[in-house]
């Protein structure tokens, strides 16, 4: 099994390729690392292959904030330059400048 380098970085704001939500990346797995139940819950027409980076996002849409787990192929850079309004963002990140968040000291792997 080969893994690829992650295209997106922790602290980067991204949006979903299909669904209307955006978020800030707070962790990344080199390959799919969630449950088979979760895998099968992804609509088959957009179900990605498992051998690619998967990102943990503090996500938001028009109605709510939540944590999302999204494959690299389903993400695009967010070019709005706007911060994410997720209530937990300030617990993980200390600042937002130039469209990118900076982790708080001591947060990380």
What are these regions (language model features)?
Residues 46-109:
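Intrinsically disordered, low-complexity, charged/polar segments
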Residues 1-13, 18-22, 29-32, 103-109:
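Mixed-charge, Lys/Arg-rich low-complexity intrinsically disordered regions
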Residues 12, 41-46:
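Intrinsically disordered, low-complexity boundary segments flanking structured domains
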Residues 25-27, 59:
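Residue-level recognition of conserved beta-strand positions in structured domain cores
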Residues 32-41:
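Short, solvent-exposed secondary-structure boundary/capping segments
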Residues 4-6, 38, 77:
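Generic alpha-helix detector with strongest preference for long hydrophobic helices that associate
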């Amino acid at each position: 099994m080969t893994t690829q380098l992650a295209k997106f970085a922790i602290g980067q704001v991204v949006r979903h390729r299909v669904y209307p939500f955006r978020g800030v990346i707070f962790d990344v797995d080199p390959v799919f690392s969630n449950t088979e139940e979760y895998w099968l819950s992804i609509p088959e027409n957009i179900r990605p292959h498992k051998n690619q980076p998967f990102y943990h996002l503090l996500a938001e849409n028009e109605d709510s904030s939540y944590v999302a787990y999204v494959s690299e192929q389903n993400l695009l850079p967010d070019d709005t330059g706007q911060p994410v309004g997720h209530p937990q963002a300030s617990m993980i990140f200390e600042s937002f400048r130039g469209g990118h968040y900076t982790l708080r000291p001591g947060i990380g792997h």
